[in-house]
């Protein structure tokens, strides 16, 4: 097993629109070893989110397209994986904590169900087992009265608690 967990090489991403082509990411390269933390910082609109979404295979196509580069995770080129293999990888081996949880959480679904869903999909847990696990995860991220909060909706939580729900997921 390689020491390099994630390697991005010369990644370029563009969005083709009727008004022209917008180059969101231009030849970005970086690597991340196991146990390391990488902070991606920059001005608004510089490509941080597009880079992260590219790693997860979540660039909307069209209009977005990865024009060139390589994204390797544990020695697998993610750009060569079929959609099902990439879906299995997402949420189990690699994930993203979105910056604004209110736009990522579904406002009409209780948070317990939202935390439980990836557990059912990626670990094959039953609904009841996944909800029990969701309560444990909410407790681990220090949501007060975590098991009672399983039935709460995103708008009933503070911004910080919503962010912790995303971390639990």
Regions inferred by a protein language model and the residue ranges of each:
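ABC transporter nucleotide-binding domains
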Residues: 1-169
């Amino acid at each position: 097993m390689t020491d390099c967990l994630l390697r991005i090489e010369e990644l370029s991403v563009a969005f083709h629109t009727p008004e022209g082509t917008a180059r969101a990411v231009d030849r970005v390269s970086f690597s991340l070893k196991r146990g390391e933390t990488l902070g991606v910082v920059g001005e608004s609109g510089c490509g941080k989110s597009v880079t992260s979404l590219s790693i997860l295979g979540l660039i909307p196509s069209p209009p977005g397209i990865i024009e060139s580069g390589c994204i390797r995770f544990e020695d697998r080129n993610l750009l060569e994986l079929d959609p099902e293999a990439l879906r299995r990888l997402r949420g189990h081996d690699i994930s993203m904590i979105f910056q604004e949880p209110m736009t990522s959480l579904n406002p009409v679904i209780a948070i317990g169900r939202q935390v439980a869903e990836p557990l059912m999909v990626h670990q094959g847990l039953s609904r009841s087992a996944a909800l029990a696990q969701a309560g444990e995860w909410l407790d681990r991220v220090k949501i007060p009265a975590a098991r009672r909060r399983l039935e709460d909706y995103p708008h009933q939580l503070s911004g910080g608690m919503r962010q912790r729900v995303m971390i639990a997921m």
